[in-house]
Every structure is written in structure tokens, then in C-alpha cells.
Amino acid sequence: MGNVPSAVKHCLSYQQLLREHLWIGDSVAGALDPAQTSLLTNLHCFQPDVSGFSVSLAGTVACIHWETSQLSGLPEFVKIVEVGPRDGLQNEKVIVPTDIKIEFINRLSQTGLSVIEVTSFVSSRWVPQMADHTEVMKGIHQYPGVRYPVLTPNLQGFHHAVAAGATEISVFGAASESFSKKNINCSIEESMGKFEEVVKSARHMNIPARGYVSCALGCPYEGSITPQKVTEVSKRLYGMGCYEISLGDTIGVGTPGSMKRMLESVMKEIPPGALAVHCHDTYGQALANILTALQMGINVVDSAVSGLGGCPYAKGASGNVATEDLIYMLNGLGLNTGVNLYKVMEAGDFICKAVNKTTNSKVAQASFNA
């Protein structure tokens, strides 16, 4: 739209949406705060009630919620696992102050997210950003209905996590032999032995354990990874007692085609209800890959607010799929997440300002720059 003023663009965009989708109007007004109602009124966006649609407006973000999904095979509810505080921040070169991390997590806890991965109980020699794991775990306010898992690569880390108050843990494996040696300094087989000790101890204490499989769609050292290899590692983790296996496109090279082939293989051994996907957006395929997974029966998705992240052992890998962008897509599909998009955007704005970064979320960029 060239040099058209942003306010005019805003009005034109909404008017186009009105012509194409016929929002409901007055019945929504009571659910909006005065500022949101004023914005809608000024943009002349209220229209007669049309059954089948509903609108939620947060700041400058308007999401059309379809009552019935427009695509087949999608779940009604999608659980979002927010990994920003751990996977998102671990690659930041400048150490983020502990009080900022705590405030960040507390803000995320007020968004409706039900799972927030808090930190990693790893050696500070390997991941300096996570050196304050105990202080962060003890410092956050744990909200009712929100789970706060932590990453524990070995038995020592597990015991430290439990002492700090952790009630859920995760272990981080790989489908690539080279990546396993670079990331956790041992072979896949050796890592499985360590994880078995951790998961066994966790089960003994009634602490749920989640398993990650990195490099599920490609490795920075080995290139392509066969679906069979991903299946083997996933089956081992599931068999030792991990209640959920998160399949990670660590370097973001996957496509809907490779996602489909990988999931078809893994789902022969593990039910879709025990699987999650964890997509990085290096090649801009994350949302497309997630949609493919949803259509195949997956209903758990990992993401990071503002698209935070990367990988210290995968040069050039971009951040995780942005939680804001994921929610926007899911809202548009009529899928319930229970998460407030605007509050997530606020949390993202907070952490980006704190670490002096620009958000990688397209939704946040479009909204805050409108």
C-alpha cells in the first residue's frame, strides 16, 4: 500500500476483512474493554450479528475465530508448550539478569499458557545463560493450573532441579550421532543410559518426564536424518517412561513433506496423543510444518514468544516459531488454545526490550508498527 498513512492502512485492512468475512458486532462489544471498543467504533468495524463468527480484538490485533475449523483433521484444542525462558534465552550471548527472567516467566504465567519451560539444570560451563537455574526456579510465582518443567540432562541435574522445587522435568536426546556428541558430549546410546537413570528416578518420585528428540528433520553436521532413526530414538524415550515426545526441527530445514514422512514413521510406534512438534523457522517453514502435524493428529506444539532462540551447536539456525504467530494461525483455524494473544505479545515486548532485540514475530511486528 506504498506510502499510505498507517491509520488509513489500518482502516482499509479492516474494511477489507469486513467485506470478506462479515464479523459479528454488537454482541462482542460487552466483552471488550473501552479502548478496544473505541478502536472498533472509530474504524466502523461493528456489523450486524452473523452466526458462525466471533471476534476478539487486542490492541491492534484482530483475529477472526471460525466456529468450525475450515480444514479437515484438525484437533479442537492445541496445547502450547512455551519454551522461551529456556530454549529461547539459552543462546543469548549477554547474560539476562535473573530478575528479568523471573518477571518474564511471571508475565507468561498470566497469558493462559498451561506449560512454561523455565530453565535448564545444566553445567554453567556449557550453558552460562542457565547458571542461575536454582534462583529462577525458586523465584518465580507458580500459578495454579500452570506447569513449569525444567531440562535435566543427567542425574545430578535432576537432583538439583528437585531440590529447587521442580515438579516436572525433560530430557534432551538427538536423532543424530554427531549432534548428540556436540550437544551433550556423548553418543546416542550413552545418552539413553543417562536418560533412563533420570526418568527412572523421576517416576519413583511421581515426577512427569518429557523427552526431546532434536534433529528430527535434519542435522547441521550429518544433513538428512532418516525417519527410522527418529523413530528409534523416540521409541526408546517413550519406552523408558517419557509421557510425551517432542520432535524437534532443530535447524529449521524441514518442509511439510519431510514432516509428514517423519511423523508417519514415528506414529507407527507412538500414538499421536503422546507426540509434540518443536519447529524452528530458519527457512520460514515452521507454521506450514506445524499445520501438517496438526492435520496428522498432533495437538501439542512447542513455541517461543517473539521467536526467541537458536542453537549454540547449530550455526545459522534461527529461533523457534513465535508463539504469537502460532496463536494467530490457530485462532484463524478456530482451534482453542486458552491463551490470550495480546498478553503474550506484551510478554514478548517486555523480554525483547530487556535483551535489546527486535521481535521475530510477524504478528507482533505488524501490530506494534501499525
Swiss-Prot record:
Outcome following mutation: L237S: Abolishes catalytic activity
Domain of life: Eukaryota
Cofactor(s) it depends on: a divalent metal cation
Catalytic site positions: C311
Coiled-coil intervals: none
UniProtKB keywords: Cytoplasm, Endoplasmic reticulum, Lipid metabolism, Lipoprotein, Lyase, Membrane, Metal-binding, Myristate
Record-linked Pfam families: HMGL-like
Gene3D superfamilies according to UniProt: Aldolase class I
A molecular-function term among this protein's GO annotations: hydroxymethylglutaryl-CoA lyase activity
Similarity section: Belongs to the HMG-CoA lyase family.
Name of the protein: 3-hydroxy-3-methylglutaryl-CoA lyase, cytoplasmic
Organism: Homo sapiens
